[in-house]
């Protein structure tokens, strides 16, 4: 590139960054989107049910995938009150303290200057060609499960949606640890002795059934988003750890309808996708108070905890309430042309900036393949350990393959700030010694 062209390009990049810089008002708005009132829609009232008979009336406030499964008569949803999911003051304060320190680099997946908090709290702008990428960074450095947490158990059920037959049921445990950019739980701001410069790790272990018991998965994500994740699988019957090839994160996970890349809504790097912000609208998302839902003691938790019930066609749909939320519509197209999907559409909650409330997954032909939703409970209406944490609790999920008429559902018992999450749990050596 000639010097003049380089100068013009750098100038344009600088002007773009300046034009979309955040202000103190943006910080207030991003964490308090309902300060001036909750969204409304004609005919929508808390307590009502949206079903096949009336769904067309509410099509504009439903994610396309949600509309499809209701229109087919497979499920119906009950509308709840819109509520505030206030994030921890430590995260808000970190955002304010580090305002405008984070900048995008020249390539998708490049970020410099990020310390902690929400990196890009300004309202996304359709005129900003990288607005979608900024939202993706907000998700990566968001508070899905906080600095550290555990789910034990997560009950994963595989079903034939046409008949409701349970084909397989697994009991899993999941553990999450942020090594860097921590905002609340000691050690802050980072776990020491992190020579590999990891940002976050996920560790999973199968408890049941017996033929899969002690199968383990470890994902290590680097702070440098351009660096490929390290992923390892331990198969108990083989008693050996093997490293997963990159493409295996898009294989069916333990025979379910999920890929590893689907975890938490999206479990990949920012640089793995081309992100496009499609606009802001009000959409119904599954967000609720756990203690106010239809609950089941089917799984007989020894502590008396009751899980969100399933229902609808084939028992493929969680029985939680949905509330009208401000969302950012975000499209992600895989950079890898051999990826098994053509794109995902996320309806990102503007307050939490999580990606898992409502998602459509499209096949290589561009047709909807799966409808993916994770319902969140307000922490103050969940387990005592979660009260006051300010972390939306992933409470139940439904992954519905609308082409194959198959589903995978999940019920969580998640705990925030779980102390039995030592860094050693997230090392390969731990997998070998956990039999």
Protein language model annotation of sequence segments:
Residues 22-229, 235:
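Solvent-exposed N-terminal domain segments of exported/luminal and surface proteins
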Residues 22-123, 238, 249-317, 325-326, ...:
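Non-transmembrane domains of secretory- and envelope-associated proteins
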Residues 99, 162-195, 199, 205-208, ...:
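Extended beta-strand-rich segments in extracellular/periplasmic secretory proteins, especially
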Residues 220-224, 343-357:
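A short, surface-exposed beta-strand/turn
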Residues 244, 358-359:
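Beta-strand-dense domains in secreted/periplasmic systems and polymorphic toxin scaffolds
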């Amino acid at each position: 590139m000639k010097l003049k062209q380089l100068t013009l390009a750098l100038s344009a990049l600088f002007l773009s960054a300046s034009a979309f810089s955040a202000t103190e008002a943006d910080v207030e708005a991003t964490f308090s989107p309902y300060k001036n009132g909750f969204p409304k829609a004609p005919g929508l009232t808390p307590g009502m049910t949206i079903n096949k008979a009336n769904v067309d009336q509410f099509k504009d406030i439903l994610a396309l995938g949600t509309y499809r499964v209701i229109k087919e008569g497979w499920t119906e949803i009950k509308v709840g009150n819109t509520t505030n999911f206030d994030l921890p003051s430590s995260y808000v304060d970190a955002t304010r303290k580090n305002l405008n320190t984070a900048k995008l680099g020249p390539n998708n997946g490049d970020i410099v200057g990020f310390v902690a908090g929400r990196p890009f709290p300004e309202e996304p702008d359709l005129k900003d060609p990288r607005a979608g990428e900024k939202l993706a960074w907000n998700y990566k450095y968001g508070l899905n499960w906080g600095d550290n947490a555990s789910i034990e158990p997560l009950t994963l059920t595989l079903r034939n949606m046409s008949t409701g037959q349970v084909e397989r049921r697994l009991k899993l445990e999941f553990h999450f640890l942020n090594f860097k950019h921590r905002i609340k739980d000691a050690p802050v701001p980072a776990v020491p002795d992190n020579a590999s410069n990891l940002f976050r790790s996920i560790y999973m272990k199968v408890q049941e059934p017996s033929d899969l018991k002690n199968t383990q998965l470890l994902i290590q994500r680097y702070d440098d988003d351009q660096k490929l994740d390290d992923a390892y699988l331990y198969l108990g019957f083989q008693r050996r750890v093997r490293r997963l090839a990159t493409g295996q994160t898009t294989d069916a996970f333990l025979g379910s309808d999920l890929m590893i890349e689907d975890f938490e809504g999206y479990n990949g790097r920012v640089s793995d996708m081309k992100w496009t912000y499609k606009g802001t609208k009000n959409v119904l998302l599954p967000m609720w108070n756990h203690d106010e839902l239809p609950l089941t003691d089917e799984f007989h938790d020894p502590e008396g905890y009751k899980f969100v019930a399933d229902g609808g066609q084939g028992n493929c749909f969680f029985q939680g309430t949905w509330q009208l939320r401000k969302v950012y519509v975000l499209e992600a197209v895989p950079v890898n042309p051999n990826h098994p999907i053509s794109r995902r559409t996320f309806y990102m909650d503007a307050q939490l900036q999580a990606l898992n409330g409502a998602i459509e997954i499209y096949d290589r032909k561009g047709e909807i393949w799966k409808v993916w939703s994770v319902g969140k409970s307000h922490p103050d209406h969940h387990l005592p350990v979660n009260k006051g944490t300010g972390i939306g609790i992933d409470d139940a999920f439904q992954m519905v393959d609308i082409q194959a008429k198959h589903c995978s559902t999940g019920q969580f018992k998640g705990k925030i700030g779980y102390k039995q999450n030592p860094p050693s749990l997230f090392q390969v050596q731990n997998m070998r010694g956990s039999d």
